[in-house]
Structures are given as C-alpha cells and as structure tokens.
Design a protein with these regions (language model features):
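N-terminal glycine-rich FAD/FM-binding segment characteristic of electron-transfer flavoproteins
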Residues: 2-271
Length: 271
C-alpha cells in the first residue's frame, strides 16, 4: 500500500477535500470562440484525477480513527455530478458553489470563493490535488491557505497525522523534504500518495442521498464584482488552432526502395 498516515486517536477530524470538474484529459480540448475560455461542454466532464487522490487520502485518515469528509467544489450546475462522484468514494457530504457570475474566474478568484466557503466551518484539514488537468497552475492550494491564514504543505507524497500534528514528505530533486505543522492546515497531494478506490455500489447509492449544500456567491458573502472573466487578472487574449499534421510520404519498394528513401532524406536535408 503506497502512502501512510496515522490518526488523531479519539478525536473527530473534520476534513474538507476540494475537487474540480474538468474535461476528460484524453479528449481534445477546445476554447470558446466568444471569450477564449475553456469550452467545458466540448468533452466529457470528470473529476480532476489528482483530486481523487486527495479524496482517498482523506478517507484513509478517517478510517484509521474517527472523522468526516466533506467535498467542496466550485463550478456550473453540472459540477454537482463530480461532487456526488467524490462522495460515492466514501465521503459524507458535499458543498457546491454555483453562480453564473463565476464563469471565466481565474485562480485568484477561485481561491477567494473556496476560502470563503471554508471559513467558519471548523475544518481541521483541507486537502487538494496538487494541480488540475485543465490549467496545471498548481497555485490554488497555496492561495487558499494564504487567504485563510493557515500553514500550507504542498506536493505531499506521504501524509501522517498524529496527536494533532501533521507531517508530510515531499519528493525533491535531491531526496525528500519532511515538513511538520499543527492543525488546521492545507495540504496538496501528488499521485504517488495512494491509489484511489473504486466506489462500491452501496456508496454510489448512498451518495445520491448524501447531504449537499448548493450555494451562490451571495450565500458565502461575495459580490459578483470580485469574480468572473471581467475581473480576472489572467486571461487568454488570443489563440490559434493547432496546425493540421501533414500527410506522411509513402514509399513503395519496387526494387529501388533504398534509392527512394535516400532521395527523400536528401530533399528533407536530413543527409
């Protein structure tokens, strides 16, 4: 079993796992012609892969002791499906932040929304996947930690929780770092942390009835002027379609194949 952890024995641990709904990483991604944002309807929507590792790590922690796991996601109405999918792995409840004004929000706005949704809920540990497959910026966990004034422990491939203290190992080019912190704290995990479980049929059915809050910006005390494409500090100004691949040259060997190959290599200036 990869990854390891220990629980705070005898203490209820409240864990929040932030997940993102993204286009399937194997599908061709497209940008919207109107505002140059990612066209999320152009491919199947799935739970961000690394976020599944975050959910798994949270579940392993509470299974070694006591606690509850809440899934938090920000996104359009369809993102509720990804919250339910994460709950079906074994989490207890979900929070979905959905508002039309969120369209086009950048990492700064995303971190603001997530932090406001987390505030005041008494979470001991907030876990993220280290990056999302649609943006790959790897900055939202650190931004959320900064907004909440909490320690951040990023890119963890091993998580240990014991006696109210958190220890993570982070692989580096020269070995690994061992970082310690008190709780509450924010952690982001990489794919080497564990192996995400498949939801059982029982948990899939239970996820349909699990409590889930659907909140607007107003519900978490934010104004639309703080989020969205118009207020984003990072935007795509222009883009171009990838050039189509040219058809390859087919050489038929009629007894002089070697000469044809040599001639082709000469014309391409390879020799």
């Amino acid at each position: 079993m990869r990854g390891s952890f220990q629980s705070i024995l005898g203490v209820q641990v409240k864990i929040c796992v932030c997940v993102k709904q993204v286009p399937d990483s194997w599908a061709e991604k497209k940008l919207s012609a109107g505002d140059s944002t990612l066209d999320r309807a152009s491919a199947d929507r799935v739970v961000n892969e690394l976020d599944e590792y975050a959910v798994e790590e949270a579940l392993r922690i509470i299974e070694a002791g006591e606690g509850e796991v809440t899934i938090l996601s920000m996104g359009p109405d369809e993102a509720a499906d990804s919250v339910r999918k994460a709950i079906s792995m074994g989490a207890h409840a979900g929070i979905h932040i959905s508002d039309p004004a969120l369209h086009g929000s950048d990492a700064l706005a995303t971190s603001l929304v997530l932090a406001k949704a987390i505030e005041g809920r008494g979470f001991d540990l907030i876990i993220f996947g280290s990056e999302s497959t649609d943006a790959r910026m790897s900055v939202v966990p650190a931004m959320v930690a900064a907004r909440l004034g909490l320690p951040q422990m990023t890119f963890a491939n091993k998580v240990e929780l014991s006696g109210g203290n958190l220890t993570i190992h982070r692989v580096t080019d020269y070995g690994y770092d061992e970082v310690q912190s008190s709780l509450p704290a924010v952690v982001s995990v990489v794919e080497k942390t564990n192996e995400p479980r498949y939801p059982s049929f029982k948990n899939i059915m239970a996820a349909k009835k699990a409590p889930m809050e659907t909140l607007s910006l107003a519900d978490i005390g934010l104004d639309a002027s703080t989020v969205g494409l118009a207020n984003a500090w990072s935007q795509v100004n222009d883009f171009a379609e990838r050039a189509a691949k040219a058809k390859g040259t087919i050489i038929t060997d009629d007894g002089n194949g070697a000469e044809k190959i040599e001639e082709f290599l000469v014309t391409q200036k390879f020799i």
